[in-house]
């Protein structure tokens, strides 16, 4: 019988809550085996006796209450709540090892605990986030950020841009590529054979027939019409204020929002801290928590693992859907 896929869980910033969140994975039995990538002694210390921490062996069976750790050594000792640029290389080494394992077939997916972008940049490494790093290191020219939680799937046409820059970034080429990636991953990794995507407009009231902006008429609608002609089930452009009501949301499988704060506040309100960040378009599956390093909680034992658990659950479902689709 073939062994089940392994999920690589990167433990993230060592001064943050990532290591202790990862230690809590031993509290549950998982359909696929989670393996934590991190410094062995760091993870064991943050587990604080709540789990049996053992060295990762590829062929060892999963065991209740046991946490498998693939040892990646810290550069310098880590203290809860105290960032040290000397460990930036360690954080990136976790990601590199996880990507290598996914590309080689050792791992079925990556689940990432939070990193601290600022301290990585302080170390002299230009780093804008997991998403961009993974795209670069897998040779992926375009990826799409989607948040999942509270019964919603919300993808973004643009991500971390100033609001003033968003209209110029919403081009036919960007929307075409974004919708193709979203559609492909909903079908191949979410098990939705013919996904229905609700597309938000950019302007209030979706432009009010051109009286409040013409992006809907000149850019968004023509792209949707062309892709409908290829068989995609697309609804929109819809006014965002009425799109995010239960009746409308119930008519679609996912939402494409035009910018970060158009879509994510609704999802984060609905998910109650259990949201999951998914990177679409990669050749590998990657999910992540939807929160930061929470340095003030590190080492206190009070960090909530809900988002990490949800990220592991979603990665598991995506692996299973992908394998069925193959």
From Swiss-Prot:
InterPro entries: PdxA (IPR037510), PdxA_fam (IPR005255). Its cofactor is Zn(2+); Mg(2+); Co(2+). It is found in: Cytoplasm. Binds 1 divalent metal cation per subunit. Can use ions such as Zn(2+), Mg(2+) or Co(2+). GO terms for molecular function: 4-hydroxythreonine-4-phosphate dehydrogenase activity; cobalt ion binding; magnesium ion binding; NAD binding; zinc ion binding. Its EC number is 1.1.1.262. Pathway: Cofactor biosynthesis; pyridoxine 5'-phosphate biosynthesis; pyridoxine 5'-phosphate from D-erythrose 4-phosphate: step 4/5. A divalent metal cation binds at residues 160, 205, 260. Disulfide bonds: none annotated. Keywords: Cobalt, Cytoplasm, Magnesium, Metal-binding, NAD, NADP, Oxidoreductase, Pyridoxine biosynthesis, Zinc. It catalyses: 4-(phosphooxy)-L-threonine + NAD(+) = 3-amino-2-oxopropyl phosphate + CO2 + NADH. This is 4-hydroxythreonine-4-phosphate dehydrogenase. One of its GO terms (biological process) is pyridoxal phosphate biosynthetic process. The lineage of its organism: Bacteria, Pseudomonadati, Pseudomonadota, Betaproteobacteria, Rhodocyclales.
């Amino acid at each position: 019988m073939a062994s089940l896929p392994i999920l690589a869980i990167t433990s993230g910033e060592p001064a943050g809550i990532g290591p202790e969140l990862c230690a809590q994975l031993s509290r549950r039995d998982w359909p696929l085996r989670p393996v934590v990538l991190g410094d062995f002694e760091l993870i064991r210390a943050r587990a604080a006796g709540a789990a049996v921490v053992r060295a990762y062996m590829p062929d060892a069976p999963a065991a209740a209450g046991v946490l498998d750790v693939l040892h990646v050594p810290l550069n310098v000792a880590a203290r809860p709540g105290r960032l040290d640029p000397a460990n930036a290389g360690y954080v990136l080494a976790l990601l590199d090892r996880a990507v290598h394992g996914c590309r080689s077939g050792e791992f079925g997916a990556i689940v990432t605990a939070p990193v601290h972008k600022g301290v990585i940049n302080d170390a002299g490494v230009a780093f804008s986030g997991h998403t961009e790093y993974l795209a670069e290191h897998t040779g992926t020219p375009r990826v799409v950020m989607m948040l999942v939680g509270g019964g919603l799937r919300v993808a973004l046409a643009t991500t971390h841009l100033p609001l003033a820059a968003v209209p110029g970034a919403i081009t036919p080429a960007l929307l075409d590529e974004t919708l193709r990636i979203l559609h492909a991953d909903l079908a191949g990794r979410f098990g939705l054979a013919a996904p229905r995507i609700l597309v938000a407009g950019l302007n209030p009231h979706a432009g009010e027939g051109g009286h409040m902006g013409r992006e809907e008429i000149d850019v968004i609608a023509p792209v949707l019409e062309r892709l409908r002609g290829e068989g995609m089930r697309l609804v929109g452009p819809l006014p965002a204020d009425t799109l995010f009501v239960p009746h409308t949301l119930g008519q679609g499988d996912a939402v494409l929002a035009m910018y970060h704060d158009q879509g994510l506040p609704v999802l984060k309100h609905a998910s109650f801290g259990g949201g999951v960040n998914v990177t679409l378009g990669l050749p590998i599956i990657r999910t992540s928590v939807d929160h930061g390093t929470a340095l003030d909680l590190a080492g206190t034992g009070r960090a909530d693992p809900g988002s990490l658990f949800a990220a592991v659950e979603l990665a598991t479902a995506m692996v299973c859907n992908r394998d069925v689709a193959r």
